[in-house]
């Protein structure tokens, strides 16, 4: 009988050679750093604890089977990674989540297996609200939305999705909003120095923190936003922050600073729109002080900022609006039914399209291995495509995809890794921005392929085999990102690159 099954939970613990995905993300987002303490609740073999300790993070872990004698201690960051999946008793599952939360000072990381496609029934047996695997371990698979509701209800919180099946739960509401706002911040770099005046050179050290602040926030700092010593030094030398910034403007291109300010105002629009999409928008005084200063600087009032964000969010309900935005986008590769954008160029899309993608990534989390994002035009869907060899292969093959339907909120996964004839990419430079390190190399190859007429029959070259066959017919071989011409039965001998 099912009741007589003895579930061997410890057999679900995995041996890893690297940090687990939830911990890796926490490190990337600087949730975990050398100044934080870390506790792994249900650490298994203790791999994450060992690796974080080697990174000089104060770490400890407990596991009922492998480390039962380790004391349960509170920490800044607590990890409950893939534990909820393996507990067959629903009351014990809830208790584990709540215990981990009680140990959390700042951020609780919750990770669980989620359903992204139908589960194979082979060698599995229904058990409770999950399945028993062939290894005699219990597995509870959640829908992504179901997992968030479970965490929110059990802890009375608003968990933040970071990736599929991975959530950060913040103790401090303002820290949560800071994290969200940082998520939507597009990448920019400080304008380069064009004319180093004597005053700039003499005060370079004092001015650098001001340059960094404006680059990050797109505005001048309010009193108290800079480190006290930094602010004091600037005021002693220049009498005011504004006068100090004038010295920076004299050494740089003012238009570039205006562009940064504009980009940051768009980031705030995206943030406010997607916070409203996820849940009820916080009141102005509930926002972190820095975000309040951002809103005042760019919009004047919170109401005006919200009206601009809401206008864009609500317009997404009209497919013609999305279609027009995709068709006029200066970033990405356009096709009749979609806009394809490299992950590094997402922040350069206009706010409407960033909000469109955010409706998927902020509810479900963005898949970690995303290379290309596909924004569908004719239906509310976002696809995340994985091309592991994008940089090195001239025409990389699709390995996997995640498709999120924004109407049904269903997730589907496609696995192309075993296909003998997978889809491939052409014109790689169209997916990225001109600032991408290999943009020129990609563009040069495309120019050569166009000159040789290799794109004249697009229906024949969309897959690896079709493309290779076409190249062979034209006596052309590609090595790296260079074309070589050869004669039949003769080794390639000449690069076609000018």
Where are these regions (language model features)?
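Class I (Rossmann-like) S-adenosyl-L-methionine-dependent methyltransferase catalytic domain
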Residues: 1-73, 109-199, 452, 460
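Short, glycine/acidic-rich beta->alpha junctions
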Residues: 44, 88-92, 297
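Long, continuous compositionally biased terminal/linker segments
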Residues: 81-85, 181-187, 334
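Basic, alpha-helical nucleic-acid-binding regions used in initiation and control of genome expression
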Residues: 1-3, 11-32, 168-169, 184, ...
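Class I S-adenosyl-L-methionine
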Residues: 104, 117-120, 130, 137, ...
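A short glycine-rich, Lys/Arg-flanked "PGG" loop and its adjoining helix->strand segment in the class I
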Residues: 94-108
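A short SAM/SAH-binding and catalytic strip from SAM-dependent methyltransferases
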Residues: 77-91
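Amphipathic coiled-coil/heptad-repeat helices and related helical stalk/stem segments
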Residues: 22, 45, 93-96, 291
């Amino acid at each position: 009988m099912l009741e007589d099954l003895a579930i061997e939970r410890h057999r679900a613990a995995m041996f890893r050679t690297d940090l687990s995905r939830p911990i890796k993300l926490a490190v990337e987002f600087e949730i975990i750093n050398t100044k934080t303490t870390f506790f792994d609740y249900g650490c298994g073999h203790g791999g994450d604890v060992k690796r974080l300790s080697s990174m000089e993070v104060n770490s400890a872990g407990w596991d009922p089977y492998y480390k039962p004698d380790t004391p349960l201690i509170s920490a800044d960051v607590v990890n409950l990674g893939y534990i909820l999946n393996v507990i067959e008793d629903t009351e014990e599952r809830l208790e584990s989540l709540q215990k981990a939360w009680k140990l959390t000072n700042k951020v609780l990381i919750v990770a669980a297996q989620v359903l992204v496609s139908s589960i194979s029934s082979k060698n599995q047996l229904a058990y409770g609200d999950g399945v028993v695997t062939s290894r005699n371990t219990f597995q509870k698979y959640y829908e992504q939305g179901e997992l968030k509701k479970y965490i929110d209800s059990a802890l009375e919180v608003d968990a933040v999705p970071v990736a599929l099946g991975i959530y950060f739960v913040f103790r401090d509401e303002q820290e949560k909003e800071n994290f969200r706002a940082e998520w939507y911040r597009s990448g920019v770099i400080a304008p380069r120095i064009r004319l180093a005046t004597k005053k700039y050179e003499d005060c370079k050290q004092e001015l650098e923190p001001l340059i960094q602040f404006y680059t990050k926030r797109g505005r001048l700092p309010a009193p108290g936003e800079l480190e006290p010593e930094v602010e004091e030094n600037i005021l002693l030398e220049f009498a005011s922050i504004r006068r100090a910034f004038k010295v920076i403007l004299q050494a740089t291109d003012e238009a570039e600073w205006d562009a940064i300010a504009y980009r940051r105002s768009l980031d705030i629009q995206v943030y406010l729109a997607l916070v409203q999409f996820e849940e009820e928008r916080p009141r102005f005084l509930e926002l972190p002080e820095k975000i309040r200063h951002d809103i005042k600087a760019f919009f004047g009032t919170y109401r005006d900022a919200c009206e601009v964000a809401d206008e864009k969010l609500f317009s997404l309900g009209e497919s013609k609006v999305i279609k027009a935005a995709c068709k006029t986008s200066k970033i990405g590769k356009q096709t009749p039914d979609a806009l394809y954008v490299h992950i590094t160029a997402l922040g350069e899309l206009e706010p409407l399209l960033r909000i469109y993608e955010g409706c998927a990534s902020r509810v479900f989390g963005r898949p970690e291995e995303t290379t290309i994002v596909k924004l569908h035009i004719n239906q509310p869907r976002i696809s995340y495509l994985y091309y592991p060899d994008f940089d090195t292969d001239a025409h990389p093959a699709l390995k996997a995809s995640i498709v999120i339907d924004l109407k049904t909120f269903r997730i589907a996964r496609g696995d192309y890794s075993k296909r003998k004839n997978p889809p491939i990419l052409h014109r790689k430079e169209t997916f990225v921005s001109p600032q991408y390190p290999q943009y020129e190399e990609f563009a040069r190859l495309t120019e050569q392929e166009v000159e040789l007429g290799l794109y004249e029959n697009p229906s024949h070259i969309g897959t690896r085999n079709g493309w290779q066959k076409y190249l062979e017919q034209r006596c052309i071989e590609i090595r790296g990102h260079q074309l070589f011409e050869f004669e039949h039965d003769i080794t390639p001998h000449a690069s076609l690159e000018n």
